[in-house]
Amino acid sequence: EFAFAETVSPAAAQKLLQAFERSVSASASAASASGRAMKWWETKNAQYAFLTDLDPAKGKKFVADSMKLMTALRKGFEYYVPPKGEMAVGKVRVFRRKADYQAYRKATGTVDLQSCGLWDPNRDELLIVAESPEEALATMRHESFHQYLHYATKRGDHAPWFNEGHATFFENVKYNPAKNTIRVIDTGNRA
């Protein structure tokens, strides 16, 4: 089951974001007092901007590998759904802990206790929880198609069968990091 963000007015979204930032600031202060500071850092390339609170020592490799994966996925997405013009830089927010992801979702207007990531078109963010790297990458393969489709077609009102069908299709590709390519695997499973 996949969760989608509800529409929130810009003014309400701004208030929610400010509340979240105060909450994160309080969490960071508490974490800092306990020796576990939550610091966000960003890495960009031509296609994506990653913002994360992962420990930089381990997180830099995860983010670099994720950027490579998403670059390979983008080629596949473009083959099946060619973009209509220039694409915006995709924003990806990676959370170290699911509890922080849930707090962020709650602060931005959605209580979400089940998902470990999603594409939020209202905030133009792909959100991912990285507690389990394998689950994070599977979620990223799926949700990044929603993000791509939104930017590639300059709209967000796609038929659910098309949007979810393609996202599920790309969720199951096999990635070859040495060649930075994806391979479609048809297991015969159908929705």
Which role fits each region the language model picked out?
Residues 37-159, 174:
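Juxtacatalytic substrate-recognition/specificity segment
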Residues 1-39:
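N-terminal low-structure segments adjacent to metalloprotease catalytic domains
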Residues 20-31, 101-105, 148, 187-191:
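Generic hydrophobic, helix-prone segments enriched in Leu/Val/Ile
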